[in-house]
């Protein structure tokens, strides 16, 4: 089952989510939008197992990373009518 991994611009570039992911789905890429000059990226979402460890590791008040699990994806992203 394919999961959607969404990274928001509230990311502070701390790398906690990257280190928490057991499947190496995430990596950091250059970005000028925060002090750390990097943001999480999810180039390997096909490897995501939906454990949401990345969400748990995120230290921001508004989770900067969200994992939408399979069937939940369209509903959570407001794509159903």
Swiss-Prot record:
This is Photosystem I iron-sulfur center. Apoprotein for the two 4Fe-4S centers FA and FB of photosystem I (PSI); essential for photochemical activity. FB is the terminal electron acceptor of PSI, donating electrons to ferredoxin. The C-terminus interacts with PsaA/B/D and helps assemble the protein into the PSI complex. Required for binding of PsaD and PsaE to PSI. PSI is a plastocyanin/cytochrome c6-ferredoxin oxidoreductase, converting photonic excitation into a charge separation, which transfers an electron from the donor P700 chlorophyll pair to the spectroscopically characterized acceptors A0, A1, FX, FA and FB in turn. The gene is psaC. Its EC number is 1.97.1.12. It is an enzyme of class 1 (oxidoreductase). It is a peripheral membrane protein. It is found in: Plastid, Chloroplast thylakoid membrane. The lineage of its organism: Eukaryota, Rhodophyta, Bangiophyceae, Cyanidiales, Cyanidiaceae. Keywords: 4Fe-4S, Chloroplast, Electron transport, Iron, Iron-sulfur, Membrane, Metal-binding, Oxidoreductase, Photosynthesis, Photosystem I, Plastid, Repeat, Thylakoid, Transport. GO terms for cellular component: chloroplast thylakoid membrane; photosystem I. InterPro entries: 4Fe4S_Fe-S-bd, 4Fe4S_Fe_S_CS, PSI_iron-sulfur_center, PSI_PsaC. Disulfide bonds: none annotated. The eukaryotic PSI reaction center is composed of at least 11 subunits. Its main location: plastid. [4Fe-4S] cluster 2 binds at residues 21, 48, 51, 54. SUPFAM superfamilies: 4Fe-4S ferredoxins (SSF54862). Binds 2 [4Fe-4S] clusters. Cluster 2 is most probably the spectroscopically characterized electron acceptor FA and cluster 1 is most probably FB. [4Fe-4S] cluster 1 binds at residues 11, 14, 17, 58. It catalyses: reduced [plastocyanin] + hnu + oxidized [2Fe-2S]-[ferredoxin] = oxidized [plastocyanin] + reduced [2Fe-2S]-[ferredoxin]. One of its GO terms (biological process) is photosynthetic electron transport in photosystem I. GO terms for molecular function: 4 iron, 4 sulfur cluster binding; electron transfer activity; metal ion binding; oxidoreductase activity. The keyword Coiled coil does not apply. Its cofactor is [4Fe-4S] cluster. Residues 2-31, 39-68 form the 4Fe-4S ferredoxin-type domain. It comes from the Eukaryota.
């Amino acid at each position: 089952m394919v999961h959607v991994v969404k990274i928001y611009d509230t990311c502070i570039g701390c790398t906690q989510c990257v280190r928490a992911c057991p499947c190496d789905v995430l990596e950091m890429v250059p970005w000028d939008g925060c002090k750390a000059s990097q943001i999480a990226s999810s180039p390997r979402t096909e490897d995501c197992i939906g454990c949401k460890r990345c969400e748990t590791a995120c230290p921001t008040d508004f989770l900067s990373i969200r994992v939408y699990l399979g069937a939940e994806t369209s509903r959570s992203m407001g794509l159903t009518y």
